[in-house]
Amino acid sequence: MRRQRRHNVPALAVAAVTSVGVAVVLALVYAPSYVNYDAQWALVWASDLWLGVTPEYTADFAPTPHPLATAVSSLALAFGHEAHLAILWLSLLSFGALVYLTYRLGEELFHPWVGVVAALVVLTRPAMERDALIGYQDMPFAVLVIGAVLLEARRPRRGVAVLALLAVAGLLRPEAWVLAGLYWLYLWPPAAPAERARTAALVLAAPLIWAASDWIVTGDPLHSLHGTAALAEEADRRRSPEQVPYWTAKYFGYALREPMMLGVPIGLGFAWLYGRRRAALPAAIVVAMTAVFAAGPLFGLPLIRRYVETPAVLLTLFYGLAVCGWMLLPAGRARSRWMAVGGLALALSVAYVPWHVTKLQNVDRRIEVDGRMYAHLQVAAEAPVVRAAFARCAPLTAADHRPIPFARFWLDGAPGSVTTVESGASPMGRMLLLPRRNRSTGRVYKKSTFPRVKPPDGFRQIYRNPSWRVFAAPGCSA
């Protein structure tokens, strides 16, 4: 027991150092300063709950509410208007944990160097870094799922511990419900009746909690399904079953980039020849999660790249096998051949480095430019003249949906106090928020999509900064 404890302490220390180290490096390199639209809405809903009002799940263009994201956002509210920074750090720490867990899973299933290569791939993917840098819940979700896979890899049919992690993950994304259900069926044959009942409770916990929260807030236990489908239609997102094959492949390519996608089939071939049993677990998870992604349009759900992020992380293990699988083989002709194949797979990735660096620089530019735009929005919402007018004349109308949760949070507004005229979602209020045309807003508001909304007659400008203007009706400002 003491030996086990001594072994666990260094492992936990390495995990903590890796998580914190990756988070600090990303923070220093990119200086992230804002969270994504969904995460900002979670902060708004958490604030509603703490104020004792019904969360505004049915607001104009509101995203899908994720129960765990809202619960965690409640803790971040202690930081006031800077609560988004707490969410950002949690996301960055989750990304660091994901890098570590990827290494541990590769080591457990195959070889330490397979884990090292896979972890380096995860660490350097522009799409994954970008999601971590703006606080998407897909980061902690991936950590929970990969953690569950690691527990199962260490001890097959582990049961409760794996299902517990999937239950928590199921409060962030519903794909975990399917994984939990399939795992429960896998546990069924040798399990006693009492164990089946106990594990079934864990399988059902997340979907029941999610449905209950939707029902309590909106009166519709399937609000998340209906709302997500409706928003996908409003935003004209990809949601046709005919688009599934193309965009599934495209999104995996976006997540891993081209050289990795060329290396993954090589790794799958190696696994088929030399490690089928060890590769079965991550391969099964990839297949199951990809199938859930592909089935989404049948229910009106959109095809979004982030939805394949967790299976993409698991595919990095097979790229690691392509590069380092030869280390698993005894000396001989096969080992030499696979060493050459691994060298080729690695060479393709190295040749792609200049393009890859450009993509990482694009992430940096996006974080910097969009961060400036949202910083200007916070300054506008906190300006005394704007807050005074808002107190007299709410609701504030935004030209489009993007500023809604940010403006509402920084204005300390009540449900319904910030709306949009986009697609006729709400009528014009007595205040209007408009973006300005400049470099800070140019990435989000391109020329073809810039809101074409004009202030109504009688409105006058009461505030402006480099990115935003605020107009108000007569009598709203001093």
PLM-predicted stretches and their roles:
Residues 345-405:
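Membrane-embedded, lumen/periplasm-facing catalytic core of multi-pass transferases
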Residues 36, 127-140:
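Short acidic/glycine- and proline-prone juxtamembrane loop motifs at membrane-interface regions
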Residues 41, 180-181, 193-265, 347-362:
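Membrane-lumen/periplasm interface segments of specific transmembrane helices
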Residues 154-155, 159-160, 178-205, 273-276:
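Perimembrane helix-loop-helix junctions
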Residues 89-109:
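Transmembrane-helix motifs of polytopic, lipid-linked glycan transferases
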Residues 15-18, 164, 201-208, 263-267, ...:
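Signature aromatic-anchored transmembrane alpha helix within multi-pass, membrane-resident enzymes
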Residues 184-188, 253-283, 287-290:
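Hydrophobic, aromatic-rich transmembrane alpha-helices
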